[in-house]
Amino acid sequence: MDSYEYTELLKKLNTKVQNISRVIKPQDIEIRLKEIEDIENRPEFWNDIKKASEIGKEKTKISNMLCKFKNVKSAISDAYELYELANAEDDEQTINSLFEDAQNLENKITNLEISMMLSGEDDSKNAIVSIHPGAGGTESNDWASMLYRMYLRFCEREGFKVETLDFQEGDEAGLKDVSFIVKGENAYGYLKAENGIHRLVRTSPFDSAGRRHTSFSSVMVSPEVDDDIAIEIEEKDLRLDYYRASGAGGQHVNKTESAVRITHIPTGIVVQCQNDRSQHKNKATAMKMLKSRLYEFELMKQQEANNAIEKSEIGWGHQIRSYVLFPYQQVKDTRSGEAYSQTDAILDGDIKKIIESVLISQKSSANKE
């Protein structure tokens, strides 16, 4: 790195800090913290434990955000001042030290950007993920299985816990359907970026002629809703089907009709669970899945979310990411516009950078609007 590159980097980082400031509005955070302090000093504050807890969580979240912002802003300012001073005094040792620390400075900005992206009301919640293959039989079933493995490896890398709720094996290979819950800090905040259609292009291992095939799978991600969130579900709007579990493992498989499928007739949302031997427990889990899906459905309606998955055939029109393995190797996300050549690593779960690029891109677009 030379002096020109370093000064350009500082300018770029300073612009990012200004953009972040416009989004998080630090002055408003300080006003809100003062309001919370006044509320906490009221004698009746602890009369409502639930409300007090919610206020405490809000205070912690916005305090941490403000602290990170101030630290980053101060680090950029200090770097500017120290560089100008060292440059004026021809202090090469200090200048080289600043050059070496440039990546660390850039990482601080990126971490702040990601913290800003994951500050939504539901981002800290667990995530319920469902993968559905599109038309194409064995090809699409295998692609859905590859995506499932990719997410399992991602969760392993991030220290998230995964609990499979429903697993339907494909007739020849792969899977027909899978639903699982991901538990961990900001699980939904990260995985919500995976909501959409994923497209695979490759030479088929199931085609003796070795022809190129295109497959699609949809990924649906919902926040796990708290029990105290009121989602009204009327019994008359539900159709319940019971069937024998067909997933991998478990001595109860194919012996009793313990698996449960629930269809919410007004929205067409379908959830199913065969995780437990008990039909009652599977029904309770499926109802929780339905509640989470309906909660996400209402959020999408209210926010007119652009990334809402439409009730249509899985195909070309709604894809968020393409994974091309032949005739060249590239993964490209249509939202961030970023392309990646490390296809093997990505399919092995190395998707955090892709997700973070999408989150930053979406926030930047929303800020421009």
From Swiss-Prot:
Q: Which InterPro entries match?
A: PCRF, Pep_chain_release_fac_I, Pep_chain_release_fac_I_sf, PrfB
Keyword flag Protein biosynthesis: yes
Q: SMART domains annotated for this entry?
A: PCRF
Q: GO terms for molecular function, please?
A: translation release factor activity, codon specific
Subcellular location per UniProt equals: Cytoplasm
One Pfam family this sequence matches:
RF-1
- Which keywords belong to this entry? Cytoplasm, Methylation, Protein biosynthesis
Q: What is its main location?
A: cytoplasm
Q: Share the record's PTM remark.
A: Methylated by PrmC. Methylation increases the termination efficiency of RF2.
Q: What GO cellular component term, any one, is given?
A: cytoplasm
Tell me where in this chain the PTM N5-methylglutamine is found: Q251
Role of this protein: Peptide chain release factor 2 directs the termination of translation in response to the peptide chain termination codons UGA and UAA.
Q: Which family does the record assign?
A: Belongs to the prokaryotic/mitochondrial release factor family.
* HAMAP family attached to this UniProt entry: Rel_fac_2
**Protein name per Swiss-Prot or TrEMBL:** Peptide chain release factor 2
